[in-house]
């Protein structure tokens, strides 16, 4: 079994969720490194993808020295630099965007909307969902604010997102923020959706075999 090196800390709740789910599934050895969230968000906001990719590559190098043989980032927004990172990473990457795109296609969804940070929603997941129609809702700011409320543990944000989901003319909503897995699951979600975190976790477990 391959050893996973996970870059976490963006945010911490989602990182803990990744750890819990991987442990519950009986994953092999896991190495975790905590990224500087302020630096990452500043770089994403400035579209400084080359510098951000270099930062992540250095973190992955440290994970590799610790014994990791495959790597991943436990957050969606930092994947803004994933194409640049793929060119310089010292370890194979399992990236959440490609895993999510494959899941959307497998389910036959043609038109989707995204829930997540403003960066992710407005950029249509950084334009990387090839061949999939991604609409940008008029409520981008409301989605961002509701998402941040869910990160803070509030229930109002979840209710707002559920209401917006029912109003959107799409086949499904992509939960494109890892913290959303902390508030949405199959028991409380009554709209068609793709949970990118759970999709990513399945891809990670497959890559570790």
Task: Tell what function each PLM region has.
Residues 1-209:
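Non-catalytic structural scaffold of enzyme domains
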